[in-house]
């Protein structure tokens, strides 16, 4: 069972009890039968009259943040459970992240957050193959419109092709989600903006960057976001755009998880936004016009 903690936290039409009932052995109880190795060739009468119990299943649960709640774990009817944690030898803390993951933090005023993101896409970092997470579907939708308006203005002014930016959310049909993920895997999508729906249980092998446009509220959500990159030994980068009023909470969260020392802080000098500003203002005006028409 992958993403075990998420599945345990939701009923999903009582899937746990339904599955486990189907997996239970149907033979006699272990307490009433001798193990198979005790039978001999002469014990044909015993073989005919007494059934050897069928073997039970082996249950393997995988998650980056597996629950330790006894009530939830007991629902799985585990026998002699063993807990195995995989991490780097020197790593401490409750959460383990791969050594090939590079974590970055940019502290910015709220009104400059989009400019910081645009600078990451068109500045020195030149970020592509990125997942960009927002706090909600509405926030993701608004950000995508703003980025698309900017790309259109930027392409007209610079004669450069616009970035391919798309919106991924629970509002899309399943077929549309699959089509969008295939396009990302083929390199046809530069930035995929989404809420936390995609952060768990979806395997995208070529995610180079994860951007938390809105920082997560807890460490478990942070781990599942950044876990979309640096997979299977690949190198990946996780970027967090932290508003000034969020710095204390964000740094404390990382510190308690033993990750603060691994994060690199970046600072963008004020003049770096100058080439972006005219096109950003034009995009803002178009966004305001769009939302005024929808009211």
Task: Annotate the PLM regions.
Residues 97-155:
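Conserved interdomain hinge at the start of the Helicase C-terminal
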Residues 82-87, 129-131, 151-171, 191:
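Conserved RecA-like helicase motor-core motifs
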């Amino acid at each position: 069972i992958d993403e075990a903690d998420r599945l345990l936290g939701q009923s999903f039409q009582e899937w746990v009890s339904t599955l486990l009932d189907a997996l239970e052995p149907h033979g006699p109880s272990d307490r009433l039968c001798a193990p198979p190795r005790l039978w001999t060739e002469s014990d044909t009468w015993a073989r005919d009259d007494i059934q050897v119990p069928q073997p039970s299943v082996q249950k393997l649960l995988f998650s980056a943040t597996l629950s330790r709640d006894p009530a939830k774990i007991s629902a799985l009817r585990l026998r002699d459970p063993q807990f195995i944690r995989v991490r780097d030898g020197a790593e401490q803390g409750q959460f383990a992240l791969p050594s090939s993951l590079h974590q970055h933090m940019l502290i910015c005023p709220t009104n400059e957050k989009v400019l910081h993101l645009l600078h990451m896409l068109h500045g020195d970092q030149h970020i592509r193959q990125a997942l960009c997470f927002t706090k909600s579907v509405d926030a993701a939708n608004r950000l995508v419109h703003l980025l698309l308006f900017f790309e259109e203005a930027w392409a007209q002014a610079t004669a450069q092709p616009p970035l391919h930016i798309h919106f991924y959310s629970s509002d899309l049909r399943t077929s549309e989600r699959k089509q969008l993920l295939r396009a990302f895997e083929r390199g046809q999508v530069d930035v995929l903006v989404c809420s936390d729906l995609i952060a768990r249980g979806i395997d995208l092998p070529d995610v180079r960057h994860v951007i938390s446009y809105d920082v997560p509220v807890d460490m478990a959500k942070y781990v599942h976001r950044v876990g979309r990159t640096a997979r299977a030994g690949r190198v990946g980068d996780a970027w967090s755009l932290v508003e000034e009023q969020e710095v204390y909470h964000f740094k404390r969260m990382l510190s308690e998880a033993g990750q603060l020392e691994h994060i690199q802080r970046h600072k963008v000098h004020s003049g770096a936004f100058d080439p972006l500003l005219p096109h950003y203002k034009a995009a803002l005006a178009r966004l305001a016009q769009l939302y005024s028409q929808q009211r």
